């Protein structure tokens, strides 16, 4: 057992799920860069970072896009309102670099196929579009 009370078998199962998902994503998307935890690329007009955690196992989508008309106070209020209604993810504004981001975390309790991966990703993009359109106006 580890400090998280996971058996060796469960640790291996979770690692296999995370490894399988990462390999699937690399085959499905045109990856621009990657490191030990994340894959980065462009997707539907967003900068996309997908990060993986073997321990939990989790897959985290972070979508970011530049905002050309910054209005910090108004946009922070809108982001807070969006977050009150957003169940799966969170909306944020980084006024220092002038970008909007949407972040969503998904449990990987079973291996994904391409159809399920794109369903999850495209739902995140739809929510990011909703947030971006409200914040960019």
Describe each PLM feature range.
Residues 9, 13-17, 70-75, 116-123, ...:
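Short amphipathic alpha-helical segments
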Residues 24, 78-85, 120-131:
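Conserved short hydrophobic interaction patches
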Residues 1-49, 84-94:
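Charge-rich, low-complexity N-terminal segments
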Residues 93-122, 126, 133-137:
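Well-ordered alpha/beta subsegment
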Residues 62-103:
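Short, internal acidic amphipathic alpha-helical interface segments
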Residues 50-66:
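A short acidic-to-branched-hydrophobic micro-motif
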Residues 6, 61-68, 110-113, 117:
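Short histidine-centered catalytic/ligand-binding loop motif
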């Amino acid at each position: 057992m580890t400090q998280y009370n996971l058996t060796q078998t469960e640790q291996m199962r979770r690692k296999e799920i995370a490894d399988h998902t990462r390999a699937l994503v690399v085959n499905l998307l045109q990856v621009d860069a990657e490191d030990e935890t994340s894959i980065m690329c462009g997707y539907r007009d967003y900068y996309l970072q997908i990060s993986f955690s073997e321990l939990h196992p989790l897959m985290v989508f972070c979508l970011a896009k530049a905002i050309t008309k910054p209005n910090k106070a108004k946009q922070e209020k809108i982001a807070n309102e969006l977050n009150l209604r957003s169940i799966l993810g969170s909306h944020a504004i980084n006024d220092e670099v002038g970008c909007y981001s949407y972040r969503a975390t998904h449990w990987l309790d079973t291996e994904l196929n391409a159809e399920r991966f794109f369903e999850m990703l495209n739902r995140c993009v739809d929510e990011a579009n909703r947030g971006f359109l409200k914040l960019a106006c």
